Amino acid sequence: MAKKVVGSLKLQIKAGQANPSPPVGPALGQRGINIMEFCKAFNAKTQEMEQGAPVPVVITYYADKSFTFETKTPPASFLLKKAAGLKPQGKRNRAKGSEKPGRQTAGTVTAKQVREIAEAKMKDLSANDVEAAMQIILGSARSIGIEVKG
């Protein structure tokens, strides 16, 4: 007999840096998920990824307190900012886009870089082909004030 699914949980955790402190610990603990077991499994699965990259994860938890999780690719905005060479700044130490997208640019990327990002994100996007995925990535670039050349 299949396990009974109790629910699912979506989190965004930095690759290789899952630990039992907030926000991961409380989110898992109140659902009865073994926090250390998840942290070890997540860190092992994301060790090949760029350390510190935000990784969306969907955790499905069951009535017997077991769980499964699926990692996705980092957000398009993170990949675009990285490709544009935007440096982390501020108290949260994050790269920022333009304060006035459409009026001023925060950086530039090439069409080739947009294609690479679209190909990497293809499995997570609702696009049928790379061209449609590129249009989605171009929209993200426009909304954070990154100009696309070429």
From Swiss-Prot:
SUPFAM superfamilies: Ribosomal L11/L12e N-terminal domain (SSF54747), Ribosomal protein L11, C-terminal domain (SSF46906)
UniProt xrefs under NCBIfam families: L11_bact
GO terms under cellular component: cytosolic large ribosomal subunit
Processing after translation: One or more lysine residues are methylated.
InterPro entries: Ribosomal_uL11, Ribosomal_uL11_bac-typ, Ribosomal_uL11_C, Ribosomal_uL11_C_sf, Ribosomal_uL11_N, Ribosomal_uL11_N_sf
Gene: rplK
Keyword Calcium tagged: no
Keyword check for Ribonucleoprotein: yes
HAMAP family (UniProt xref): Ribosomal_uL11 (MF_00736)
Alphabetized UniProt keyword annotations: Methylation, Ribonucleoprotein, Ribosomal protein, RNA-binding, rRNA-binding
Organism (species): Paracoccus denitrificans (strain Pd 1222)
Subunit comment: Part of the ribosomal stalk of the 50S ribosomal subunit. Interacts with L10 and the large rRNA to form the base of the stalk. L10 forms an elongated spine to which L12 dimers bind in a sequential fashion forming a multimeric L10(L12)X complex.
Example GO molecular function: large ribosomal subunit rRNA binding
Gene Ontology process terms (BP): translation
Role description: Forms part of the ribosomal stalk which helps the ribosome interact with GTP-bound translation factors.
Lineage of origin: Bacteria, Pseudomonadati, Pseudomonadota, Alphaproteobacteria, Rhodobacterales
Stated name of the protein: Large ribosomal subunit protein uL11
Membership in a protein family: Belongs to the universal ribosomal protein uL11 family.
UniProt region (Disordered), positions on chain: 83-111
